[in-house]
Amino acid sequence: MEITFQKVEHRYQHKTPFERRALYDVDVSFPSGGYYAIIGHTGSGKSTMIQHLNGLLQPTNGTVQIGEHFISAGKKEKKLKPLRKKVGVVFQFPEHQLFEETVEKDICFGPTNFGVSVEEAKQKAREAIELVGLEPELLARSPFELSGGQMRRVAIAGVLAMEPEVLVLDEPTAGLDPKGQNELMEMFYKLHKEKGLTVILVTHNMEDAAKYAEQIVVMHKGTVFLQGSAEEVFSHADELEKIGVDLPMSLKYKRAIEEKFGISIPKATLSLEDLTHEVVQVLRKGGHESCSS
């Protein structure tokens, strides 16, 4: 299900003295089945942008097309319920939205709300809890007896139980330790590959953006600043830093090595493994001569 933003603008509290423009002239497409990252400094418009994907926000100008659904300025979209079934959104700290007596009831809430029978919803809950790497035995427990990481996985299972075609992730690993962050990101990538889900990730973690995303959209002051593959985007390191966007750690190390040893590493290195390989290649080609001079 392809998603397209066409000249989208969004203003909060439009036509009031408190009006604030959050998005303008946003033209971007997310073809079906891809893995995308949206990055940018705080306040760049990332979260406002993704709230247009399932009709939580409506453009002030322009159109957002999600598959067969059109959300346009001044026109009320009548079929938001089927749209919200197809576009699952995992907001920051989704565990704060848990409220039912048991894990099973919490996961079943979404499917039953969309008209699925109780028995079918229970089956979906069993499938979803296994997708997020939890044991089915937890279905009978209160979600509030679980660890923070388990609660987050339960909340994500509630989104997956609705079998969305698009999964939107807004800082999904916020507050987790490094091990938990890595496990969750690997889980999302596995779902993307095995289920063919379109994934749109909003993140401040540049390592995750570089590692997982096929295309990266850089937002700045409410509009698209850059778009391309990780290699293309992070080749503009100086420009990114000027607008407050961090760089992957491997690029920071690359710069430090170049400055310290007086060598040039031409290729953008987006992982420490890539960096190690490129340093070895440069030294083999005679880059060590620069080091000794």
Swiss-Prot record:
UniProt superkingdom: Bacteria
Compartments reported by the entry: Cell membrane
Family: Belongs to the ABC transporter superfamily. Energy-coupling factor EcfA family.
MF annotations from Gene Ontology: ATP binding; ATP hydrolysis activity; ATPase-coupled transmembrane transporter activity
Matching Pfam families: ABC_tran
Binding locations of ATP: 40-47
GO cellular component: ATP-binding cassette (ABC) transporter complex
Disulfide bridge map: none
Domain ABC transporter stretches: 3-246
Membrane topology reported for the UniProt record: Peripheral membrane protein
Protein name in UniProt: Energy-coupling factor transporter ATP-binding protein EcfA2
Entry keywords, A to Z: ATP-binding, Cell membrane, Membrane, Nucleotide-binding, Translocase, Transport
InterPro entries from the UniProt entry: AAA+_ATPase, ABC_transporter-like_ATP-bd, ABC_transporter-like_CS, ABC_transpr_CbiO/EcfA_su, ECF_ABC_transporter_ATP-bd, EcfA2, P-loop_NTPase
Coarse class of the protein's main subcellular location: membrane
Keyword Translocase found: yes
EC number assigned by the record: 7.-.-.-
Keyword Transferase in annotation: no
Function: ATP-binding (A) component of a common energy-coupling factor (ECF) ABC-transporter complex. Unlike classic ABC transporters this ECF transporter provides the energy necessary to transport a number of different substrates.
Oligomeric and partner information: Forms a stable energy-coupling factor (ECF) transporter complex composed of 2 membrane-embedded substrate-binding proteins (S component), 2 ATP-binding proteins (A component) and 2 transmembrane proteins (T component).
